[in-house]
Amino acid sequence: MSSKPKPIEIIGAPFSKGQPRGGVEKGPAALRKAGLVEKLKETEYNVRDHGDLAFVDVPNDSPFQIVKNPRSVGKANEQLAAVVAETQKNGTISVVLGGDHSMAIGSISGHARVHPDLCVIWVDAHTDINTPLTTSSGNLHGQPVAFLLKELKGKFPDVPGFSWVTPCISAKDIVYIGLRDVDPGEHYIIKTLGIKYFSMTEVDKLGIGKVMEETFSYLLGRKKRPIHLSFDVDGLDPVFTPATGTPVVGGLSYREGLYITEEIYKTGLLSGLDIMEVNPTLGKTPEEVTRTVNTAVALTLSCFGTKREGNHKPETDYLKPPK
């Protein structure tokens, strides 16, 4: 790490219209209530909380074909992109608290305006790469990557609310980790475009250590560049993050999640982070909500240097009694 790391700006994105379930807009508040901001301030980073973005309802937001709430999702992402771009311009790491994963469109678009050479690590049970034509649900939280990829430009009609979006990443700039629920159309896209992925099968076969090694070699082998980590908490097994909208059994363990974030921290290249799909209203018990939120907090802290082996302040001699 450089002697003084970049500051962090926390941006709340309390948005739920990329999917049908209420409650995910309460994610940012739940993460803050669990002490995320205070705990981040205990790290080596300077932390500023931008607060939550205020999203206004778009009236008469009728579906586009089967795509639901297109104008609301498009407008909210446009707002988020502007704030993230401003944050990045100031040399700050953007930390977006979701909110549903459709907000990655704005988060990554805004980040790429300032760092067009960025790469994306997408941790998720799902690829979120359905297009408005391949989606069977019409929910935009299953489509953000399709809007971001240059190779899919022109492969689906213009969706109202998204005229501002310019695809900003190539198929070779993204790696998926944790996949285990991929639609046929999505599978066709990732195979056809040659997108690098580590489904749970690869995680089982290689182990998470090798997965991260290969991820970095693939994305950073030729040139070091900024990393955008987009982390859907459903990437982890529902044992650890039950309070989320689309849980899928057989996911990453708590330990594997922390290993991913510890390794990303060690590169010194993390430049943008999304912590998405925490839905405090979906836990079957209060304990399930707490477990999900605390896991999301732990993953975030790990991105900024909190290690399982422990931490100590470099300038302190802990064997000297305090005066």
UniProtKB/Swiss-Prot annotation:
Changing H101E: Reduced catalytic activity. No effect on manganese binding. Substrate binds at H126, T127, D128, I129, N130, S137, G138, N139, D183, T246, E277. It is found in: Cytoplasm; Cytoplasmic granule. This is Arginase-1. The modification Phosphothreonine is found at T281. It holds the Pfam family Arginase. Keywords: Adaptive immunity, Arginine metabolism, Cytoplasm, Hydrolase, Immunity, Innate immunity, Manganese, Metal-binding, Phosphoprotein, Urea cycle. It comes from Rattus norvegicus. Residues 1-27 are annotated as: Disordered. Pathway: Nitrogen metabolism; urea cycle; L-ornithine and urea from L-arginine: step 1/1. Changing D128 to E/N: Reduced manganese binding and strongly reduced catalytic activity. Inactivated by diethyl pyrocarbonate (DEPC). Mn(2+) 2 binds at D124, H126, D232, D234. The lineage of its organism: Eukaryota, Metazoa, Chordata, Craniata, Vertebrata.
